[in-house]
A protein has these predicted regions:
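Bacterial N-terminal signal peptides
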Residues: 14-22
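Generic low-polarity alpha-helical segments
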Residues: 10-13, 25-29
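Bacterial N-terminal signal peptides that target proteins for export
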Residues: 2-15
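Sequence/structural signature of beta-propeller domains
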Residues: 26-312
């Protein structure tokens, strides 16, 4: 459960332990690392300690403000937060004119000279939603508390019935929104137009499936059977600023799918990705490339939560 104000001493203790473990290079215990994936390096960029940042499930690096990350919670009342790369909340924005069901991911992009944020209301744990929404908001020029209204929204459905989706990314150069299913095995990749010509309900196009998703080994299943079955559920996705890599986060792993120039995503995700273990997170839910494309930021739900910068 998220830490509340009466438990600040406990939060501080946990935060201290996380920092100590990270600085010591042991964010995961040896018994936890049953796989031998050669992974990227990671460092602690900051800690999320603010009670308002207690269920972060979406993260996007600002291209407008240096060292600023946009975030939103899974639960709550539909707010966007601007935070420093150290984890400090800088401003809070309320989104008017939208009905919020289950926000699960977000992305930052530039289209025709306009810098924007996309918020994905695509969560569906129960598999009951007939339609889902994506909201595009112009990125605020000032980091001051304010109310925002979407520039446009997209209502869509899946082609063959409901599914849970927590991973959404934007390929602005190709005018595409990419969506990855959470619980299907193998994970499915879908696409939607970033700027549809009309306002009707769209149907997402199935692009393909993601190759190379790790499977739990016998030892991991024996030690933690419930967790092992969830480790490959997809919780976030991001396209690099140069459009050359799709990053996919699960509860345990980071997968990187490089793409050749002019190659379609269906081909890129059909090849074995670069796979590595994530640094420790209480519940890995949020990921995006840094604005310069040199690394990725990752964090998770609950507080305190570490905010990592990962260098592939």
């Amino acid at each position: 459960m998220p830490c509340r104000s009466p438990s600040r001493s406990r939060c501080a203790l946990i935060a201290g332990l996380v920092v100590a473990a990270t600085l010591a290079g042991c964010a995961r215990t040896p018994s936890d690392e049953t796989e031998n994936f050669a992974g990227p390096s990671s460092r602690l960029s900051g800690m999320l300690l603010d009670p308002q940042l207690n269920e972060i499930s979406g993260l996007a690096a600002s291209s407008r403000h240096r060292d600023v990350l946009w975030m939103h919670n899974d639960g709550g009342d539909g707010r966007l937060f601007a935070a420093s790369t150290g984890g400090r909340r800088l401003a809070t924005f309320r989104i008017d004119g939208v009905t919020r069901t289950d926000w699960e991911d977000m992305a930052a992009f530039e289209l025709k000279g306009r810098r924007s944020l996309l918020v994905a209301d695509t969560g569906d744990n129960g598999g009951l939603r007939r339609t889902l929404q994506l909201h595009v908001i112009e990125e605020p020029a000032k980091l001051q508390n304010a109310r925002l209204t979407p520039a446009w929204s997209i209502v869509f459905r899946w082609p063959d019935g409901p599914r849970d989706c927590e991973a959404v990314a934007v390929d602005a150069a190709r005018g595409q929104i990419l969506l990855v299913s959470k619980k299907r095995n193998p994970a499915e990749l879908f696409a939607l137009p970033l700027r549809p010509p009309g306002t009707g309900v769209l149907t997402a196009t199935r692009v393909g499936t993601l190759a190379g998703m790790p499977e739990p080994d016998a030892e991991h299943l024996r030690q933690s059977p419930n967790r092992a079955r969830l480790d490959s559920h997809v919780t976030a996705a991001a396209v690099s600023p140069d459009g050359a890599t799709l990053a996919v986060m699960t509860y345990r792993y980071l997968l990187l799918y490089p793409r050749q120039p002019r190659e379609r995503w269906v081909s890129a995700v059909s090849r074995t990705p670069d796979v590595s273990l994530l640094p420790w997170l209480p519940q890995a839910e949020a990921l995006d490339f840094s604005a310069d494309g040199e690394g990725l930021y990752a964090t998770g739900e609950f507080i305190p939560a570490p905010l990592y910068r990962i260098t592939p």
